Regions:
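A structural preference for long, well-packed, hydrophobic secondary-structure segments
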Residues: 143-146, 162, 180
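Short helix-coil boundary/hinge micro-motifs
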Residues: 1-144, 148-155, 186-217
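Cysteine-rich micro-motifs
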Residues: 161-171
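Short metal-binding segments enriched for Cys and/or His
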Residues: 173-184
Length: 217
């Protein structure tokens, strides 16, 4: 598994909460295990204490994404470095479970399970993956969805660094909202214009008044 894959751990954890909507799915041991994904042995070690630990880490990781989205690269890096120091990783070379066409192991870097607890292991993995993406792709690849009130975190892997939303659904919703806002503004401007026009003359009220004054003179 490539290190870049582990960055999704950070995204999944941050997006387990939607503060603006009052939604939090990280409320049980089962929710913690689901974060790890299928087939992860570390998930079996999860306990009630890991719920609280991961919710604390979640807030710190969200701060990394928000700093990056605000263009504050130094703050984003400092926040992530603090997490990396607190939750160090144990890298190992792995490959026995993956073979090439000749049956030889496909060696790759793997992050070993953390000895302390399930949440520490998850955090170390998430932070290492995020750090890899940040250094390889750039801090500006970390973003927060612009579709109000979503604010989900995402990693921009587009070729032109143009991503603004966490999903196609949010992009569509934002585009529809922008279209309706433009349409509403156009209607309001048209209505105001009609109000100041003098019926039957095509002149605005100010122009009609000036024309009348000139005629009296």
């Amino acid at each position: 598994v490539e290190l870049a894959y582990y960055s999704d751990y950070a995204v999944r954890l941050v997006n387990s909460e939607e503060p603006a909507r009052g939604i939090d799915t990280l409320t049980s041991v089962e929710a913690v295990r689901e974060l790890f994904g299928p087939g992860q042995q570390a998930a079996r070690r999860a306990g009630e204490a890991d719920v609280t630990r991961l919710r604390t880490v979640r807030g710190r990781l969200r701060a990394v994404f928000e700093a990056a989205a605000d263009g504050d690269e130094v703050r984003a890096v400092d926040l992530l470095n603090a997490l990396l120091l607190e939750f160090p990783v144990s890298p190992q070379i792995s490959g026995h479970e993956f073979r090439d066409e000749d049956g030889r192991p496909k060696w790759h870097m793997h992050i070993a399970d953390h000895a302390a607890n399930a949440s520490a292991g998850y955090t170390a993995t998430a932070c290492m993956g995020l750090a890899f993406q940040l250094t390889e792709l750039g801090v500006d690849r970390l973003g927060v969805c612009e579709a109000h009130p979503c604010r989900n975190a995402y990693l921009d892997t587009s070729t032109n660094r143009s991503r603004r939303y966490c999903s196609d659904r949010c992009a569509t919703r934002a585009n529809v909202a922008a279209y309706r806002a433009r349409k509403r503004l156009y209607a309001e401007r048209s209505e105001r214009s009609e109000r100041v026009e003098r019926p039957g003359s095509g002149l605005t009220a100010d122009a009609a008044q000036a024309s009348s004054a000139a005629g009296e003179r």
